[in-house]
From Swiss-Prot:
Protein's gene: icd
Family label: Belongs to the isocitrate and isopropylmalate dehydrogenases family.
Keyword Ion transport assigned: no
Taxonomic classification: Bacteria, Pseudomonadati, Pseudomonadota, Alphaproteobacteria, Sphingomonadales
Residues reported to bind D-threo-isocitrate: 94, 96, 100, 110, 132
EC number: 1.1.1.42
Protein name in the entry: Isocitrate dehydrogenase [NADP]
GO biological process annotation, one example: tricarboxylic acid cycle
Reaction catalysed by this enzyme: D-threo-isocitrate + NADP(+) = 2-oxoglutarate + CO2 + NADPH
Organism the protein comes from: Sphingobium yanoikuyae
Length: 406
């Protein structure tokens, strides 16, 4: 069959270690045999970032901004040991953080559900997407130890000289205190990105807060979400047959455990930090978790696996030993990016190809072929394959599926 034409370019961001090896296999064996796609390639290996003083990361982020879609391989965020290992000029910042700061938007983590991989929460038969508002609150707070008895006040001075002052607490003795903040604009952007993600998936959106206690602070999140929804999304949601609701965080946590999935959970910063890990563990494996960064306007997206570079396996690979590394989340980084590309470009065949490759991955595992991490979740009697064998199984199954298109 003729290759499927991808109308607009996709930014491809390469990474490090074991995931870098798998990344190349995905591109060469699963993507390029079927798609005619213009890939704008950026090498974000730690060596390249060091060589360019991290300029390559900034260039890659700006390219995603220009073309609208990026797919990213896992990368090393250097610590002291890595600086020494690679002889780096300095301890470069997380590429994900740099890209996120340039693109803005919200990170949505979505699990890949495979029937025969047991879940800690068996009722979760469909994905639960957690969107985390990665700005402000505890993560930008000023906190300190209060040395002894005294009065804690909070003061705001406007640029026009207007002042607001609140007495927070009369300390009878030593303790701790904290002041934190958020911005209306950031909350609105968070709302837009969350609603756009829900629309894209065709799933309902729930915002969780504790507005009964933090009436002004969390109340602002609730009010701004409602405002954005009513003004820009109510009609679109109605047409798509989905809903938006605000829930109290305690009620939402309980509901999430009861429900089967297929919803987007918009979380404040701290809640998102905690609940995204709860959800990941509940679904069984970080090796089956994708991460999608979506801009507020819903027009710029970057997809990647939610796991790291699998250093332990890379060390085995360097010694010439076969590994059993799970490529599924990295494959889904490609498919999620391509799916958005197809939707943006209005090219249904590209979307269909992405969905086909995803189904092939799931069906391959459900058919009993898998890597060691998944086999261990199933039980001691489950056979597993090397990375190469599993990859070949996916390639063969994809070939068979694509032959049906002719």
């Amino acid at each position: 069959m003729a290759k499927i034409k991808v109308k607009n370019p996709v930014v491809e961001i390469d990474g490090d270690e074991m995931t870098r090896i798998i990344w190349e296999w995905i591109r060469e064996r699963l993507i390029l045999p079927y798609l005619d796609v213009d890939l704008k390639y950026y090498d974000l290996s730690v060596e390249k970032r060091d060589e360019t003083s991290d300029q390559i990361t900034i260039d890659a982020a700006n390219a995603i901004k220009e073309y609208g879609v990026g797919v990213k391989c896992a990368t090393i965020t250097p610590d002291e040991a890595r600086v020494e290992e690679f002889g780096l000029k300095k301890m470069w910042k997380s590429p994900n953080g740099t890209i996120r700061n340039i693109l803005g938007g919200v990170v949505f983590r979505e699990p890949i559900v495979i029937k025969n991989v047991p879940r800690l929460v068996p009722g979760w038969t469909d994905p639960i997407v957690v969107g985390r508002h990665a700005f402000g609150d505890q993560y930008k707070a000023t906190d300190f130890k209060v040395p002894g008895a005294g009065t804690l006040t909070m003061k705001w001075v406007g640029t026009n000289g207007e002042e607001l002052e609140y007495e927070v607490f009369e300390f009878p003795s030593a303790g701790v205190a904290m002041g934190m903040y958020n911005l209306d604009e950031s909350i609105r952007d968070f709302a837009k990105a969350s609603f756009n993600y829900g629309l894209n998936r065709g799933w309902p959106v729930y915002l969780s807060t504790k507005n009964t206690i933090l009436k002004a602070y969390d109340g602002r999140f609730k009010d701004l979400f409602q405002e954005v929804f009513d003004a820009e999304f109510a009609d679109k949601f109605k047409a798509a047959g989905i809903v938006y609701e605000h829930r109290l965080i305690d009620d939402m946590v309980a509901s999430a455990l009861k429900w089967s999935g297929k919803f987007v959970w918009a979380c404040k910063n701290y809640d998102g930090d905690v609940q995204s890990d709860t959800v990941a563990q509940g679904f069984g494996s970080l090796g089956l978790m994708t991460s999608v960064l979506l801009s507020p306007d819903g027009k710029t997206v970057e997809a990647e696996a939610a796991h790291g570079t699998v250093t332990r396996h890379y060390r085995q690979h360097q010694q010439g030993k076969a590994t059993s590394t799970n490529p599924i989340a990295s494959i889904f980084a490609w498919t999620q990016g391509l799916s958005f590309r197809g939707k943006f470009d209005d090219t249904p065949d590209v979307v269909k190809f992405a969905e086909t490759l995803e189904q092939v991955c799931i069906k391959t595992v459900e058919g009993g072929a898998m890597t060691k991490d998944l086999a261990l979740l199933i039980g001691p009697d489950q056979a597993w394959m090397t990375t190469e064998q599993f990859f070949e199984a996916i390639r063969v199954n994809l070939e068979a599926e694509m032959a049906k298109w002719a």
